[in-house]
Amino acid sequence: MDVMKQLSLIGIVPVIAINDAADAVPLAQALIDGGLPCAEVTFRTAAAADAIKNMVDAFPEMVVGAGTVLTCEQVDRAVAAGAKFIVSPGLNPTTVKHCQEIGVPVCPGTANPSDIEVALSLGL
């Protein structure tokens, strides 16, 4: 099933910041036990990529993505760690195009009608 469809069916995506990658698996287990088999791990900490990898390795069925992604390099690190989707706080056409080129769903933030028009022009 398509990642965006999975997230739509789950209905809510917990956004988490993990400072210690060792905390990722117990947190993922708690989310799954609570009926939320998904998470957006923010790239605001140095542990983000390792946390994503730990969660995906322990629970391959979990839909884990990366949030607060600002650059193509962060996209690559997140995807290499196992992220199944990317969220960014703003609309950076370079980052969006990179996600599209490598086949990872991306949800950029939009703040005004111009952002929406750019997103539409990018096929989002």
What are these regions (language model features)?
Residues A47, L70-E73, V79-L124:
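Conserved anion-binding
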Residues M1-K84, E101:
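Conserved N-terminal beta1-alpha1 strand-loop-helix module at the mouth
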